[in-house]
Structure formats: C-alpha cells, structure tokens
C-alpha cells in the first residue's frame, strides 16, 4: 500500500545506528557510486525520505569513489602549463582510476570493471595497474599518456578529488549551518574525502573505520542492521 516502504533505505539503518551513538552529527557514507550526507539532531534523523528529495536537498550525492564517470565530476581540467581544457563526455575513466593513481585505493579495492576492461581479457592485473589508470585518465582529454605525460594524468586525478571534496563540503556546510552541527561521522570506502571536506570546514571528524575497521566501515549498513536486530530481539 505504501510504495515508499520499498524505496532504497540502506542508509537509514546506518543513520539509525549512528543516531543512538552520537546525538548530533552529520553522518556521511561515501561508497563506490553514491554519497549519503545525513543530519542527525538530538538523536533524530532529519534526512528527507526519498532519493528525489535527498538529491534536491544535497543529502544524496550521486558520486562515489569507484564507479563514477570522471566526466560527471569535471567539465574542464588544467593540464600542462596550467592550460584549461574541456573534457570528453564519453566513459573513458572513472573515479577508481583517479584514486588508484593517487594511491588512495589499491588494485584489490578497484572492484568494478574499468571503462576499457574489454581490452584486458584475462589480464585483470594489468587492467587495474597504475599505468593503465593513467592512460584512461589521459583519454578524458581525448589524448594519450605519451602526449600529455604522467604529471598531467596525475593532475587530472588530483582535480577529480578536489571537485568531489568541494561538492561534499558544500552539502556538509548547508547542514552545519541549518542544524548547528559540529561533528561529522564517516563510513564507507571514501573516508579520505570526508576528512578533507571536514577539515576545510573546521568540523570535528570521526572515522568509523578507526573504530570498527575498514571492512565493517565499507559495508556499514549491513553491520548496522545486525546491531539493530540484536537490540530488537
């Protein structure tokens, strides 16, 4: 009878668990594809209910650490001697490529297919190598690594991170100002993005991976459900 009861709510379990641990906080979960930015005030979850409403409020950002097309994160980049260059809208590189190049994730963390996986049949180790990731990043400016050089490829990766940090910080500052929140609690594989955004806003940062470990933090909704069920029964 209520179609909203079937809506995507894995974030709700995490937020419910966090609300019982930290009464006033911005809960952020940066995953492979999306980012949840959930205000918790006085132990109450203040987030909107549907994905549409959360997208409008900035509580859901459709951008993550692995699967996001670089072309949805950036429209232009600086390469070479600070030359501005538009980028292609094709799926040439994803955020996993940027963070592999920058050293924030490993080849094992790169759990999705790369945009050019078809070219690496049976050679996944090569597909998820740093040099292959730099080659994919060079393609977003319709070039290759030989033309733009490794420094420019790394520069593109750094600009991807800078853009994602800025977008997250913009959502966080809205909630900070609206609810007077001064702490962010972070889960997911993108802890490093959240920390940088929190530092830029001078907000206290708490990483759940430092408490529960990286594996639990990366799958925090499942962990939260298990803990909530224990309390229920």
Predicted region positions:
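Nucleotide/phosphate-binding catalytic cleft detector across ATP-hydrolyzing
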Residues: 1-28, 38-233
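Conserved Rossmann-like nucleotide-cofactor binding loop
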Residues: 33
């Amino acid at each position: 009878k209520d179609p909203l009861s079937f809506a995507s709510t894995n974030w709700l379990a995490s937020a419910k668990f966090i609300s019982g641990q930290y009464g006033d906080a911005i809960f952020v979960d940066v995953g492979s594809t999306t980012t949840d930015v959930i205000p918790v005030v006085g132990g109450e979850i203040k987030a909107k209910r549907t994905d549409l409403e959360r997208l409008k409020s900035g509580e859901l950002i459709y951008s993550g650490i692995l699967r996001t097309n670089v072309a949805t994160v950036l429209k232009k980049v600086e390469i070479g001697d600070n030359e501005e260059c538009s980028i292609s809208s094709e799926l040439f590189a994803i955020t996993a490529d940027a963070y592999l190049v920058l050293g924030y994730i490993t080849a094992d963390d790169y759990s999705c297919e790369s945009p050019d996986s078809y070219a690496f049949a049976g050679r996944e180790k090569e597909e998820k190598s740093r040099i292959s990731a730099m080659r994919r990043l060079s393609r977003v400016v319709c070039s290759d690594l030989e033309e733009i050089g490794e420094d420019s490829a790394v520069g593109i990766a750094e600009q991807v991170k800078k853009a994602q940090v800025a977008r997250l910080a913009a959502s966080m500052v809205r909630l900070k100002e609206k609810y007077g929140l001064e702490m962010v609690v972070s889960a997911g594989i993108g802890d490093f993005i959240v920390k940088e955004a929190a530092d830029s806003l001078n907000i206290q940062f708490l990483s759940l991976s430092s408490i529960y470990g990286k594996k639990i933090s990366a799958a925090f909704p499942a962990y939260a459900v298990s803990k909530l069920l224990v309390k229920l029964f």
